[in-house]
């Protein structure tokens, strides 16, 4: 579960920007008890949040910041700032501006982690990982690394045994230190990498142009799950099934409908309406939220979820909560 995300100096954002899913206290919390979930770590977290803003107000750049952070975990390339992602004003004011990304989340091992990295055009300036078991409990620093004036990385704080090995031959900034520690067997680093790669989905609408065979296989597994069809058919209740195309599922899949006389007919997804095609893709992400406890950021979701469809999705989710609340972690 995502708790908080902060960043600065990214695209249109010059100053620090913070996004928090902590539920507010007071009367608002009491009025909407179904809008948040209580965790064993002492956090009350919102289940959903809506980012509202005018056109060109920075909503997409906000999500792109998360995409960029996630991409640093995906590759073993040199980690450094890219001029096209640095705020234009800062780029003119500073010779080597720094960008900070900070994320706090509840991982699958039920620990709270705070991960932060600061990067510039030279590479990683600093990187740290902190673990805690409760919202107000003492923090345990896994590692806190800083690049000094001689471009040498040093450990400021931390108890991870694997840090010494990770620091060797690491002055080229290839790959994040947290990824290196995960490869060396550090459990806290592994939990962080696992969450970033397999739990966080920042606004990527699935498509046939997916760049990972593994991710496409995961999408196919979801589409072939009967529960996925229950979500997808909310866009049109005449839909009664699908025949998934394994090579191009987002365009060549056949949508099966049944008319009032009970007769079935099929249509290729690419020939269907824009609304049906887009909801077919977003239904995969809705499935991940409902059944796999993923954290999904959806950009321009209002293109897909009109008021009627929104009510259907919410009613579907609430029905699952009421049925399985005693046994299911929300």
Question: Would you name each region that the model predicts?
Answer:
Residues 42-44, 49-50, 54, 64-121:
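Conserved P-loop NTP-binding catalytic core
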Residues 114-244:
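Electropositive, glycine-dotted interaction segments
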């Amino acid at each position: 579960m995502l708790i908080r995300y902060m960043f600065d100096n990214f695209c249109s954002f010059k100053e620090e920007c913070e996004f928090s899913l902590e539920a507010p206290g007071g009367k608002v919390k009491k009025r909407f008890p179904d809008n948040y979930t209580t965790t064993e770590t002492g956090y009350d977290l919102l289940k959903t949040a809506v980012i509202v803003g005018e056109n060109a107000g920075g909503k997409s750049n906000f999500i792109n910041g998360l995409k960029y952070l996630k991409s640093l975990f995906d590759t073993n390339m040199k980690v450094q700032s890219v001029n096209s992602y640095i705020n234009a004003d800062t780029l003119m004011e500073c010779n080597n501006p720094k960008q900070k990304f900070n994320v706090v989340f509840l991982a699958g091992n039920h620990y709270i982690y705070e991960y932060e990295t600061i990067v510039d055009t030279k590479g990683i300036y600093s990187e740290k990982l902190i673990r805690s078991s409760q919202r107000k409990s003492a923090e345990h620093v896994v590692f806190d690394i800083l690049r000094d004036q001689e471009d040498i990385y040093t450990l400021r704080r931390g108890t991870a045994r694997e840090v010494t090995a990770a620091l060797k031959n690491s002055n080229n900034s290839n790959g994040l230190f947290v990824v290196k520690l995960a490869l060396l067997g550090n459990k806290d680093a592994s939990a962080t990498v696992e969450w970033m790669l397999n739990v966080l989905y920042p606004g990527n609408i699935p498509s046939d142009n997916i760049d990972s065979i593994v991710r496409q296989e995961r999408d196919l597994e979801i589409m072939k799950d009967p529960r996925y069809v229950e979500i997808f058919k909310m866009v049109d209740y005449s839909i009664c099934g699908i025949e998934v195309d394994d090579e191009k599922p987002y365009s060549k899949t056949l949508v099966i409908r049944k008319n009032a006389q009970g007769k079935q007919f099929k249509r290729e997804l690419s020939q269907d309406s824009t609304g049906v095609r887009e909801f077919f893709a977003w239904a995969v992400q809705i499935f991940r939220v409902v059944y796999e406890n993923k954290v999904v950021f959806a950009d321009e979701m209002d293109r897909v979820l009109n008021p009627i469809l929104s009510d259907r999705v919410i009613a579907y989710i609430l029905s699952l909560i009421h049925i399985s609340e005693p046994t299911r972690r929300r």
